Amino acid sequence: MTNIRKSHPLIKIINHSFIDLPAPSNISAWWNFGSLLGVCLILQILTGLFLAMHYTSDTMTAFSSVTHICRDVNYGWIIRYLHANGASMFFICLYMHVGRGMYYGSYTFSETWNIGIMLLFTVMATAFMGYVLPWGQMSFWGATVITNLLSAIPYIGTELVEWIWGGFSVDKATLTRFFAFHFILPFIISALAAVHLLFLHETGSNNPSGITSDSDKIPFHPYYTIKDILGLLVLVLTLMLLVLFSPDLLGDPDNYIPANPLNTPPHIKPEWYFLFAYAILRSIPNKLGGVLALVLSILVLAIIPILHTSKQRGMMFRPLSQCLFWLLVADLLTLTWIGGQPVEHPFITIGQLASILYFSTLLILMPISGIIENRLLKW
């Protein structure tokens, strides 16, 4: 009798994806983040579902309904803070995952990489719309400022913004549609993630050395299931420390003030995980230029495979490229810090320099370093 795990039409798919999957024997902890992202997505969908049972998407009651969840619903406070801080953990894992892909040259799997970029955009859109839902001051003004950026599009900008708003300002129609989109997008993300995995399993995983590992594969279970559980424990511990000891550490105090269209907060800023892109947006004085830079700061990932000049796949044996990679990481941290600062001297200048360095590292310095390393190795 054949094993049901290998013969059943449905269980067979799961078996080929998570149990008998041949995986390289040398992949490090940096390969944990894919499974952690899956766990984060499941956590967000479950906590979000329970929050949606009590939330009302009406401008008059949205803020009160969130307060009601925290005060009156059984364990509502922990569900709300797991959802809010779960988003932060999601983005930490997401940026680590993308960073690992860049460092080890995983972008050479072009289909997997491009779907990953689509996933990144979709997750960012979902997180932005979720931030609007509590209808606090920062929710309202963040929605107003970010949606207003679309008015920079020539000819159709103003009409497009009013179409998204459902009126002449951010109001009830905007909140209702944002809630609807925020609810449906995680399921679209799940479908995209399945396609992402499908394409990855067509080629098999990359590994730190960057060379083919077909001759040295081991089954995913039990080796990497156990390894992933370690990463999961670290993730859960970090998340619970955040939720139980300082749940508002990564939030904005202004969001505990109900939305008021007549009173602008002194510093409008998004959640911490968007600050780097926000800093790039603010570093360009022209509105359309800023919007283009904002979109390109993520879209630049799509042309990284084209700009790969090195004859080696990853950066494991390329010290010059390693230096540039960590320079890029430091630059992104600088941009994140600048994004949270007021628009005044010296932050404006630092932001502009960091933005120039971000694009020049990715588009100019990294391809040049690949060529130099090839020459040094006489390739």
From Swiss-Prot:
Top-level lineage group: Eukaryota
Compartments (UniProt record): Mitochondrion inner membrane
Main subcellular location: mitochondrion
Disulfide-bond pairs as recorded: none
Any one GO cellular component localisation term in the record: mitochondrial inner membrane
Alphabetic keyword roster: Electron transport, Heme, Iron, Membrane, Metal-binding, Mitochondrion, Mitochondrion inner membrane, Respiratory chain, Transmembrane, Transmembrane helix, Transport, Ubiquinone
GO annotation terms (biological process): mitochondrial electron transport, ubiquinol to cytochrome c
GO molecular function: metal ion binding; ubiquinol-cytochrome-c reductase activity
Protein family (similarity comment): Belongs to the cytochrome b family.
Cofactors named for this entry: heme b
The name this protein goes by in its record: Cytochrome b
